């Protein structure tokens, strides 16, 4: 029976638990696995195994994250839970855990707290499209009016950060009660998961988006022409397709793909996630290089100025030991390219301390193919000092 869980015949979504420290995110994660395990849809995970999260590296940044997987009747979920607040900030800004939706956990005993607010803001900034709320620890609150007040506060906070505060479902329950097998609270976990199934929408899969591939390497095959290799980020490519080649300050080039190869075999097409070589008609090796991108015509354009949300590493994380000021000039690693840029601080901010998570304006030395939502690393002297995401393109 247990083997059944890994069949991939259901739509797959990435979700996570977010919210203030000690409001019960990890307990909720454990109780979801326990309740679903009773139906043969998950392997029950102990609180301690989720809380003791392994370290991962993403864009040179170490993050502690627990990945749990489970199913409902209609979907397969990968669920991310982080032990520490800083891990959430890093996880969301670096995109180590892309979330299609999240469960916001708020303890009824406290109501929304500073990190509740910060996680909602982060979710909004990094584009988590849908949230569902689990109001936890309601078994510790005797007064119905308090629960109503907490709900109003949560809804106001969600609306403030441009989520649909009026309509987002709020499920009341006790994660610990469910974990301890109390029927009443187990039922609320089932209600929560039905709500997640219905309210968190399926994302547009990468394969259904327009074609885009960052170039990693370029070489010539005698008698056949120039080949660009890379991993397809989105979409599909077929022999005979027209494409744009963009980036690094030059005018865009147009070409036609005359062959798609993978592991030295000719394919009829390549799709998101594949590492391929594309044979390009009429393109010289000297015309293109690593760091450019190949895309569906007109899909992506080069830009040099944008607003970004960035996280700056602490000294203990291998980052800078000192703050930086306005017009700081590090290297930006965008897809397969690195380019120098200037960071302009906003809102009269004078300096940025290691460990800060802030909004800034970036101006690159030369235009690069970027789009809103793109993640990047910030490096200086060969080491990663931060990570960020393009929030809005200016020019």
Swiss-Prot record:
Residues 174-176 are annotated as: G5. GTP binds at residues 19-26, 81-85, 136-139. It comes from the Bacteria. Its EC number is 3.6.5.3. GO terms for molecular function: GTP binding; GTPase activity; translation elongation factor activity. GO terms for cellular component: cytosol. It catalyses: GTP + H2O = GDP + phosphate + H(+). Residues 136-139 are annotated as: G4. Keywords: Cytoplasm, Elongation factor, GTP-binding, Hydrolase, Magnesium, Metal-binding, Nucleotide-binding, Protein biosynthesis. Residues 19-26 are annotated as: G1. Residues 81-84 are annotated as: G3. Residues 10-204 form the tr-type G domain. InterPro entries: EF-Tu_GTP-bd, EF-Tu_GTPase, EFTu-like_2, EFTU_2, G_TR_CS, P-loop_NTPase, Small_GTP-bd, T_Tr_GTP-bd_dom. Gene3D superfamilies: P-loop containing nucleotide triphosphate hydrolases (3.40.50.300), Translation factors (2.40.30.10). It is found in: Cytoplasm. Mg(2+) binds at residue 26. Residues 60-64 are annotated as: G2. GTP hydrolase that promotes the GTP-dependent binding of aminoacyl-tRNA to the A-site of ribosomes during protein biosynthesis. Monomer. Belongs to the TRAFAC class translation factor GTPase superfamily. Classic translation factor GTPase family. EF-Tu/EF-1A subfamily. This is Elongation factor Tu. The lineage of its organism: Bacteria, Pseudomonadati, Bacteroidota, Flavobacteriia, Flavobacteriales.
